[in-house]
From Swiss-Prot:
GO CC annotation, single: extracellular region
Free-text function comment from the UniProt entry: Binds and inhibits muscular and neuronal nicotinic acetylcholine receptors (nAChR).
Family label: Belongs to the three-finger toxin family. Ancestral subfamily. Orphan group IV sub-subfamily.
The protein's name: Neurotoxin BM10-1-like
Length: 84
């Protein structure tokens, strides 16, 4: 009985993936379509959005990061889907 209970606990932990994984937007446009999310790698606990002007366009990069880059036009956040 104890073996069965232990097996169920292990299977539950594996199936639920108790390790938290961050999800960030990855599109390179001003607005993103629904579902354009990336599951970040282990250790990447921030989402970021970097924008800058190039010629007559605004360029945007979004993604995951292990640290928050301290640049002028970078927005960082630490919740899922927050780098709008």
């Amino acid at each position: 009985m104890k073996t069965l209970l232990l097996t169920l606990v292990v299977v539950t932990i594996v199936c639920l993936d108790l390790g938290y994984t961050m999800k960030c937007k990855i599109c390179h446009f001003d607005t993103c379509r629904a579902g354009e999310l990336k599951v970040c790698a282990s250790g990447e606990k921030y989402c970021f959005k970097e924008s800058w002007r190039e010629a007559r366009e605004v360029k945007i990069i979004r993604g995951c990061s292990s640290s928050c880059p301290e640049k002028k036009n970078v927005f960082c956040c630490s919740t899922n889907d927050c780098n709008w």
